[in-house]
Each structure stands twice: as C-alpha cells, then as structure tokens.
Amino acid sequence: MFKPIRKTHPLISIANNALVDLPAPSNISAWWNFGSLLGLCLMLQILTGLFLAMHYAADIETAFNSVNHICRDVNNGWFLRICHANGASFFFACLFIHVGRGVYYESYLYHMTWNTGVIILFLTMATGFLGYVLPWGQMSFWGATVITNLLSAVPYLGMDLVQWIWGGFAVDNATLTRFFTFHFIFPFIILALMMIHLLFLHQTGSNNPLGLNSNVDKIPFHPYFIYKDIFGFIVFLWILVTFIWKFNYLLMDPENFIPANPLVTPVHIQPEWYFLFAYAILRSIPNKLGGVIALVLSIAILLILPFTHSSKFRGLQFYPLNQILFWNMVIVASLLTWIGARPVEDPYILTGQILTVLYFSYFIINPLLAKFWDKLLN
C-alpha cells in the first residue's frame, strides 16, 4: 500500500513522528500550550538577535552608540531591538508559567525531561544576563560588575575565577567581547537541549490535567493540537506586538539609556524583572557565599522535586491544601520580584528574608501536606 512521503522519508518522518502523527492525550488544556510558545520565543530571539548582531559592535567605545545607531539609522532597527528586548521578557514569562504548570501537575515525575528543562532554565537565565550587559549602559556595566563579583565568594578559587571571566582586573573590553560571544552561542545550545527535552518527553508521552495514564485515549497531534498551538501563537504575537508598539520601553531600566561610566554608581543596581526574585533571595542572606548558594538553589531546588514526591495521586488538582500552598508560592515569588527592585533598607530587608524563608519552605511543606491529605482520605 502507498504510504505518504512524510512517513517514509528518513528525515521528514522524524518531524512527522514529533509533530503530525504524535499520539497526544485528548484532554490537555491551554497550560500545555506554553511549550510550543517557548519554541516560538526561541526562534524569534534567534532571528532578531541575528539581525541585531549584524549591526552591533562589541567594543566598549562603540557598543552604546551601535545600539543607538540600530534604533535610529537601521531600517526598522528600533523594532528589531525592542522585539528582542521585550521578546526576552515574554520568553521568561512563558518559561515561568511552563515550570509552574510542571510543578502544579507534577510533570517532574518524568525525571529526564524535567532535568533537561531545569538545565535549559539555567542556560536561558545566563543568556538573559549576558544580553543585559551588551548595550553597555550604566545598568549593563554595574550589573555585570556586581553579578560577576559574586563568584569571588567561591572559596580559594574566587578571585582567580572573577579575573578569568573579566579578562583583566575590572569589567572592560575583554569582558564585553566574551559576553557577546557567549550570548550569541548560548541560544543554539538551548535549541539543541530543547530537542533533547522533546526527545525525552516523547519517550514517555505527555502528562495531562487528570494525571492519569492516557494511553487508552490518545489523538493525533495534527490537526487538533497544531491548530490549538497556532491559535496560541496568534494570541501571543498579538500581545507581544501590542506591547512593542504601545509600551516599548516599559520593562527597560532608565539608567541603561546612560552610557556606562565606571566612576558613577547608579543609586540602585538591579537586573531585569525576570531575575529580581532570585536577586532578592541573594540579598536576603547577609553572608556573601551564603547568598550565592541561595541564588543558585532558588532554581536548582526544582531538581529535588522528583525525589520529595510523596502523594498517591498525580497533580495538585486532587489536593486542596496543596493548591492553596501553590498559589501562596506564586504570590511569594511575585513579592520577591517586587522586593528585588526595592533599595536595601528597612522594611524591605526583613520582608525579603521572610519571603525567602517562605519560598524555600514550599518545597518542604508541599510533600508533607500531600501525605497528610492522603492519610485523611484513608
């Protein structure tokens, strides 16, 4: 019998098995749209970044002016720059929702998929930080100085590590050049990891809102979820483009429109909004090394979730007390984001410390509460 080329061609058949004939649970909701949205975001960032790199100069004398030149003189350069900057914000928003959905529906039980996902999250955060340095404004320079300086807290190797990253004794031309190099290459590494992430996901199949085995109720990915994803793309792009045209500089720091000056420190040094929760956790620990460990743990703690899982049912939809705890955690993360943008003074210091304790306590209380609920059901 004649088979279509998408099933017989050695290369096209791989894409076919991943996007067309893939068996998917029939009941996955809109929360499952964010995976494909992240793929769209990554493509958008790579494309806009590629065109920006054609006009950008990775030199401390010309970097700031080259960004200015892109926005003023290059055809639609302003659109590319703002699309890239706001695209990063939307990328992280989708990323946090995607991780949140994984925590809520306990998708972390697919160990390999979850672990690669956390590595992607780390790499994306590194890429975002490197990109923040490139315009070489005040916040770029001082943000790079403060964050890279944290590595000096590493025992014995600290200062050597910092100078190795800087390429000298201060943040200078060598630092900017290597930051641009890594900012350019990381998205392609993320793309490769994303394919591995999908490979592991397709080994097990997707989770679903009921947390049950859906092998008896699978439908082909195309046309059902292809159209669902396309609808998600349209809504996402509509919101992004509206944001670009109406609130283009809303998420950027005014300090970064001033050329970098090593002799003048900004009143309040802070990263982009999507790092503020981790930055607040870092600042809440009075000890430098302790702060760095807490900063890394704020993301790395996601890796322990598969090992602390104790519930009989899969997903928090069956655990009302855990749902309250989860949404409390979302509020805590939002408040940490707010605290990260506040100056280091009372009452913000104490508030940040309380919120940090609440943030980490979620990972301890959640499995205990699930166990308690299971006991009540017995």
From Swiss-Prot:
The chain crosses the membrane at residues 34-54, 78-99, 114-134, 179-199, 227-247, 289-309, 321-341, 348-368. The keyword DNA repair does not apply. A ubiquinone binds at residue 202. One of its GO terms (cellular component) is respiratory chain complex III. GO terms for biological process: mitochondrial electron transport, ubiquinol to cytochrome c. It is found in: Mitochondrion inner membrane. Pfam families: Cytochrom_B_C (PF00032), Cytochrome_B (PF00033). It is a multi-pass membrane protein. InterPro entries: Cyt_b/b6_C, Cyt_b/b6_C_sf, Cyt_b/b6_N, Cytb/b6-like_sf, Cytochrome_b, Cytochrome_b_C_euk/bac, Cytochrome_b_N_euk/bac, Di-haem_cyt_TM. Binds 2 heme b groups non-covalently. One of its GO terms (molecular function) is metal ion binding. Heme b b566 binds at residues 98, 197. Heme b b562 binds at residues 84, 183. Heme 1 (or BL or b562) is low-potential and absorbs at about 562 nm, and heme 2 (or BH or b566) is high-potential and absorbs at about 566 nm. Component of the ubiquinol-cytochrome c reductase complex (complex III or cytochrome b-c1 complex) that is part of the mitochondrial respiratory chain. The b-c1 complex mediates electron transfer from ubiquinol to cytochrome c. Contributes to the generation of a proton gradient across the mitochondrial membrane that is then used for ATP synthesis. Belongs to the cytochrome b family. This is Cytochrome b. It comes from Anopheles gambiae (African malaria mosquito).
